[in-house]
Amino acid sequence: MVRLAKLVVDSTQLENYKAALKEEVETSVRLEPGVLTLYAVSEKDKPTHITILEIYADTVAYKAHLQTPHFINYKTGTKNMIKSLELVGTIPLVPGMKIK
């Protein structure tokens, strides 16, 4: 399962958000075998515009991720930092391709 999370973060909270995101991403990848990739980038000219590439082994792994204490902590801790969130479902064009 592959999807994109597109966020706009409150500029006054950007550094706090990045710290929370770093902790959540590192914990998820370390503890959850079904979380294959969480790769976050910000736009060069709009640093508050963040896109996260999320790759999960399958839908079961994604749903399990949503129930973990570290993800719930991230969501509750950052809810007032995020001005907008768009979750984009995707269809991989080369499904067998792996990120090295």
What are these regions (language model features)?
Residues 2, 14-19, 45, 58-63, ...:
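N-proximal accessory regions
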Residues 25, 69-70, 79-82:
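Residue-level detector of secondary-structure transition/capping positions
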Residues 39-48, 75-100:
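Glycine-rich beta-strand-turn "strand-cap" elements at beta-sheet edges
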Residues 21, 66, 75-78:
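Short, flexible helix/strand-to-coil boundary loops that buttress conserved ligand/catalytic motifs
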Residues 1-8, 37-66:
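Short, well-ordered beta-strand segments in beta-rich or mixed alpha/beta enzyme
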Residues 13-36, 73:
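Short amphipathic alpha-helical segments
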